[in-house]
Amino acid sequence: MISPLRSWILCVLLFFAAALCFLDRQVLSVLAPQIIAEFGMSNTSYSRVVTAFVLSYTLMLVFGGRVMDALGTRRGLALSVGFWSLASAAHAFVTGPLSLGLARFFLGAGEGPAIPGAIKGAVEWMDPKRRGIAVGLATSGASLGSMIAPPLVVWIALHLGWRGAFAATAALGAIWLMAWLLAFRGLPAAATTPAANRPTSSWRALLARSEVRRLLAARFCFDPVY
């Protein structure tokens, strides 16, 4: 079992993982005018770069839960953050639209499992009575990342250039990864693994519930705007 204190520490780390996820993806959006001008990109070329991220992110967002189930949240999130941080760092070395698109594709692939993993971790490691606030805390980091991205990225770019901005945000991911591994230090893997006999529900049973269908419809309408 995980102590209550360690459970909250892990939830705070999940919060920062979500924040970094939404911070890293917005670096390009903030710096796009400068990068487009430097590489002489057209609107069509830039749209392809954006699509590369959206495509891989969408695919891995769908299958991210499977990844977390297969690897476990402990290792799965470490792999996710480590992978997207490397992809973010790769942005600092791109030489044109093609390499930029590849970096965006791998960034999306790494970030896709992050939110499913954050929700899964909050549910697994928190007492049932506090799971609601734990999930809310873990996922609200996305709003923080979106909010601080523009001023932070502009400030870094003014001092280090646009390539330095990508490298700096990648470094934040490396710091998070070290903190994540330290948080599990001395904790047996079995302590973070939920019981195998936990009741499960089929997709058919879930979709048969009207509240689930309404929630899916609401998210379908809301998420593209968000």
Q: Whereabouts are the PLM-identified features?
A:
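Cytoplasmic helix-loop-helix junction between adjacent transmembrane helices
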Residues: 103-142
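Juxtamembrane intracellular "pre-TM" segments in multi-pass secondary transporters
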Residues: 2-3, 188-216
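Residue-level signature of mid-helix packing/kink "hotspots" within the transmembrane helices
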Residues: 26, 54-62, 146-147
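Short hydrophobic/alpha-helical segments at membrane-entry points of transmembrane helices
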Residues: 98-104, 214-215
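Extracytoplasmic
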Residues: 9-43
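Helix-loop-helix hairpin linking two adjacent transmembrane segments in secondary transporters
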Residues: 138-182
